[in-house]
Design a protein with these regions (language model features):
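Short, flexible loop motifs at catalytic/binding sites
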Residues: 1-113, 117-217
Length: 217
């Protein structure tokens, strides 16, 4: 978004300072403020429209995981997806809307093809935002490894400005006093109500719940 200073500089460059010298400073200030308000309104309207369109294309009723990856996580995917990645993306897309049907899925990808990024990071967030998952658990060979995967999710939810602007429900939840609840390295709860746990292969997950919700993935 352009700053007020840059807006004024643009007006001056287009109109020329010589033509403005005949107006009192107070009149110019009022004129500048009016233009700034109108410009800010246009920017806000354009931003809201973009947000609505992107949310619909990514996580709406017919939202596509492929668009979600490209639009919000383009910094991970600089090249076109290969056949193995496309197959995994299609698998994740197919999980949507299958909350009631238990699903077991196995998909092998070559090393370095982004298994963890596509599924554990982006796939987990997309399935939460589409309300397919509400309480997933990330299980890895060790607790530290699982925490590393969860930390990647935390990093994106803290630093990915476009993702946060379009999905504020991915911010940390607030307590009854309205204060932000700090995330733990193995357990995070979002404003939207979803929760993610990180566990090692030998750690017990029995009895885990969030209010009335038990782990669903």
């Amino acid at each position: 978004m352009a700053s007020n200073q840059s807006i004024r500089q643009r007006i001056l460059s287009e109109l020329g300072s010589s033509g403005l010298n005949r107006f009192p400073p107070q009149v110019l200030e009022l004129a500048f403020r009016r233009v700034e308000r109108e410009y800010a309104g246009q920017i806000t309207e354009s931003t809201n429209r973009e947000k609505s369109v992107c949310r619909r294309r990514a996580t709406g009723k017919r939202g596509q995981f492929h668009f979600f990856l490209r639009h919000y996580f383009g910094h991970y995917f600089g090249s076109p997806f290969g056949p193995q990645q496309k197959a995994l993306i299609e698998d994740i897309q197919a999980l949507r809307g299958r909350q009631r049907d238990p699903v077991k899925m196995t998909r092998a990808l070559s090393r370095g093809f982004g298994k963890s990024t596509v599924l554990t990071l982006c796939g987990t967030l997309w399935l939460i935002l589409t309300r397919t998952w509400n309480f997933p658990i990330i299980i890895s060979s060790s607790l530290e490894s699982a925490k590393g995967f969860l930390q990647a999710i935390i990093d994106e939810c803290e630093d990915n400005a476009v993702l946060l602007e379009h999905y504020p429900e991915l911010r940390p939840k607030k307590d009854q006093k309205g204060q932000t609840v700090s995330w733990k390295d193995g357990d995070i709860v979002f404003q939207g109500g979803a929760r993610i746990l990180a566990k090692g292969f030998l750690n017990s997950i029995r009895g885990k719940r969030r209010k009335e919700s038990r782990p669903d993935a």
